[in-house]
Amino acid sequence: INHHEFMNKIPMTAEGYTKLQYELKKLTSENRPKIIEEIAEARSHGDLSENAEYQYAKEQQSLIEGRIIDLESAISKAEVIDVKSVEGDDIKFGATVEIEDDESGEKQQYQIVGEYESDIENKKLSITSPLARGLIGKTVEDNVEINSPKGLKSYTILSVKYI
């Protein structure tokens, strides 16, 4: 595999890949037809230049079509990685990492995932985020310093798992 081809690939967990496929299916089978109906409905109300409903529906359509293009592109470039088969103690894509904030003692656990599947509420951290970039390549008991919006933060890595 040449380097250029690999650069175009987007690493993704199987769960993340399935989620993107589901979102794409929902957009193409539900949202797209619905917005086309709304545009037709708004159009039937006459003068389009003064028609806020029509303008709004067209904007929504543009957002939906943009997202569909993004998703199709991401799915076509996806390199699905079986996280359970990753070996080693150092942090790589897919790792579930427990860290401790050296200042507050607060413990947090994150899984490092692709940028299309990041979801902070569910502790899915984008591989492109400053924290994930700081963690990659490190291992248990390593200390990591990250520039955050709140200044320099220091963390200790408590565990690294591939689950």
Region spans (language model):
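Short intrinsically disordered, low-complexity coil segments enriched in acidic
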Residues: 1-3, 141
